[in-house]
Amino acid sequence: MSVTVRVPAKVNVQLAVGAARPDGFHDLANVFLAVSLYDEVTATPAADGLRVTCEGPDAGQVPLDRTNLAARAAEALAARYGRAPDVHLHIAKDIPVAGGMAGGSADGAGALLACDALWGTGASREELLEICAGLGSDVPFSLVGGAALGTGRGERLAELEVGGDFHWVFALAARGLSTPAVFREFDRLGEGLDLPEPVADQAVLDALAKGDAAALAVAVTNDLQPAALSLFPELSDTLAAGRAAGALAALVSGSGPTTAFLATDARSASDIAGVLRASGTCRDVRTAVGAAAGATVLD
């Protein structure tokens, strides 16, 4: 027997970042939107402990040891229910690695849900979310999907209404960016500044609720974008190429280096993707639609 769970990527349509806290984290107002790029995590019983394998374009960049969030999720669930984490976790990876789209977090949420189903632990949604929050700031949203406002360090979620489809184009960069490195650069750039408390922008929430891409395009923001561009200046060329191709909005996705472009509709997204592919400013281009469902057990 095995259990396979499909988990979406995310884009941040608002990422407001406060000053560093004493624990090193930052308070956030983080508006997540799940999009239709997916990893699949398959859990299969094993007699010899925990093992992680991976396939996909970026598989060589995925750690297969216990630093992988999928492995940590299985261990956390096993420890909570007093059992051995005897499982083989296989990740079919389509979400970019180190791309600012929560690919690692998706694998953690997927492994957690897959192991819960495989082992019959019957964990409640609240228990699963509690374990997710212990794994990382983005993991709870990977479990929930749809759209949500994350506060605290992003792990406290309030689900949001989405009134229609939003069409996106994602340009994948030639190399990754470390999320901790981007936050360190954010701190460096903001040294001496009095940063405001991060709050959700009502214009973003209203645009999502109405399914209004034009209104969302005006409202999207990412406080980490200057830090990502400081560490990876070439991303400015990708953003410019997408804007010139007709994107309603162009921004760095989360901590980057994936860049995200909001399109009017599916045809516009396809056109923008074609221009970006020909621009020479990125290694690959993907299109997706949001909001997508969260972690889902496949039949």
Curated annotation (Swiss-Prot):
UniProt superkingdom: Bacteria
Enzyme Commission number(s) from the entry: 2.7.1.148
Active site residues of this protein: K10, D138
Keywords: ATP-binding, Isoprene biosynthesis, Kinase, Nucleotide-binding, Transferase
GO terms (BP aspect): isopentenyl diphosphate biosynthetic process, methylerythritol 4-phosphate pathway; terpenoid biosynthetic process
Pathway: Isoprenoid biosynthesis; isopentenyl diphosphate biosynthesis via DXP pathway; isopentenyl diphosphate from 1-deoxy-D-xylulose 5-phosphate: step 3/6
InterPro entries the record matches: GHMP_kinase_C_dom, GHMP_kinase_C_sf, GHMP_kinase_N_dom, IspE, Ribosomal_Su5_D2-typ_SF, Ribsml_uS5_D2-typ_fold_subgr
SUPFAM superfamilies documented for this protein: GHMP Kinase, C-terminal domain, Ribosomal protein S5 domain 2-like
Residues bound to ATP: P96, V97, A98, G99, G100, M101, A102, G103, G104, S105, A106
Record GO terms (molecular function): 4-(cytidine 5'-diphospho)-2-C-methyl-D-erythritol kinase activity; ATP binding
Catalytic activity: 4-CDP-2-C-methyl-D-erythritol + ATP = 4-CDP-2-C-methyl-D-erythritol 2-phosphate + ADP + H(+)
Family annotation (Pfam families): GHMP_kinases_C (PF08544), GHMP_kinases_N (PF00288)
Matches recorded under HAMAP family: IspE (MF_00061)
Annotated family: Belongs to the GHMP kinase family. IspE subfamily.
Known role: Catalyzes the phosphorylation of the position 2 hydroxy group of 4-diphosphocytidyl-2C-methyl-D-erythritol.
NCBIfam families: ispE (TIGR00154), PRK03188.1 (NF002870)
Record protein name field: 4-diphosphocytidyl-2-C-methyl-D-erythritol kinase
Organism: Streptomyces coelicolor (strain ATCC BAA-471 / A3(2) / M145)
